[in-house]
Design a protein with these regions (language model features):
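RNase H-like, Mg2+-dependent phosphodiesterase core
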Residues: 1-218
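Residue-level recognition of conserved beta-strand positions in structured domain cores
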Residues: 44, 85, 245, 256, ...
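Negatively charged, low-complexity tracts enriched in Asp/Glu with abundant Ser/Thr
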Residues: 212-246, 272-280, 284
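Solvent-exposed strand-loop boundary residues in beta-sheet-rich modules
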Residues: 48, 247, 267-271
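Intrinsically disordered, low-complexity regulatory segments enriched in Ser/Thr/Pro
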Residues: 252-282
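Hydrophobic residues embedded in beta-strands of well-ordered beta-sheets
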Residues: 27, 240-242, 261-262
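Ampiphathic alpha-helical segments that act as solvent-exposed interaction surfaces
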Residues: 275-304
């Protein structure tokens, strides 16, 4: 196991040079999101010293979107690249762990020539036709794995942003399928799409065949006099609750921000899209709540 203190400042080719023959790095993107496929990439860098074109390359999560796009183009120019993915249906059927391994195997098989050795980020080893070494925090240690992490991340992000044009209510253009507040609200308002992972919470809890609570929720402008009486909180995440009035109309969120529970007002205007900081209880936006409990929120919103 690799400790953080032992990580090099930048990924190197030291692990690649320990092995004879051709070496590829493999990494994935998209294990945690609520929607979209999991994508893996396999990268074989050219032999010789560290390419100057990849100076500054590291784990894709530590790079800006602009840097990732730049390195993506550079990697495509100098390296052999294979990309594989596992669909939402495969994720739900196999589970995310086995779907992840399947995507890695497909990425490996998509390379133009089979490597002799594979360095894989993490602890799990996909079944490949060569020697496989799992490297904890490999995207911080191996340049090949870092390159694969960028290719996988950019490929998947592009896919999700394209889907956002067809499904604009979930914030995929920015969250690329991860469980942000906007994504959760989109699920409540519009329900899951064909691209959502039905085996993942909250999709498999809120929208299970036995669950009906969400059907009474309304996402519309509140035209009448607002009242805090009879408010209801609906659990979304450990740090996030949706707040509805007694008629089932959505009026806000209770969110844990830096250890403090906070009320965020939400209003609905033309087109039915939510807007934070507006709505009938906008004057309370950003105020603290003692706990994520209906009575605590009622107490806050009933103050003068």
């Amino acid at each position: 196991m690799t400790s953080r203190s032992s990580l090099p400042r930048w990924p190197t080719l030291n692990l690649e040079r320990r092995s004879d023959g051709r070496v590829c790095g493999i990494d994935e993107a998209g294990c945690a999101p609520l929607a979209g496929p999991v994508v893996a990439a396999a990268v074989v860098l050219p032999p010789g010293p560290k390419p100057t074109a990849l100076r500054g390359l590291t784990d894709s999560k530590l790079l800006s979107a602009e840097k990732r796009e730049d390195f993506f183009r550079r990697i495509q120019d100098i390296a052999q690249v294979g990309v594989g993915m596992a669909s939402v249906e495969e994720i739900d059927t196999l589970n995310i762990h086995h779907a992840d391994l399947l995507a890695m195997k497909r990425a490996f098989e998509a390379l133009p020539a089979s490597p002799d050795h594979a360095l894989v980020d993490g602890r799990s080893k996909p079944a490949l036709g060569c020697n496989v070494e799992a490297i904890v925090k490999g995207d911080r240690r191996s340049l090949s794995i870092a390159a694969a992490s960028v290719v996988a991340k950019v490929t998947r992000d592009r896919m999700m942003r394209e889907l956002a044009g067809r499904f604009p209510d979930y914030g995929w253009h920015t969250n690329v399928g991860y469980g942000t507040d906007a994504h959760y609200l989109g699920l409540l308002r519009k329900g899951p799409t064909e691209h959502h992972r039905r085996s993942f919470a909250p999709v498999n809890t809120i929208f299970s065949p036995m669950a009906t609570a969400w059907q009474r929720f309304r996402f519309e402008p509140v035209q009448d006099a607002a009242s805090a009486d009879g408010l209801d909180l609906f659990f979304l995440r450990n740090d996030l609750y949706a707040v509805f009035d007694r008629r089932g109309r959505h009026i806000g969120l209770v969110k844990n921000l830096r250890g403090c529970w906070t009320f965020r007002a939400i209003g609905y205007h033309d087109g039915g899209k939510p807007e934070t900081g507006t709505g009938p209880f906008s004057r309370y936006d950003g105020m603290r709540v003692e706990a994520p409990q209906a009575q605590m929120v009622i107490r806050l919103l009933s103050t003068g």
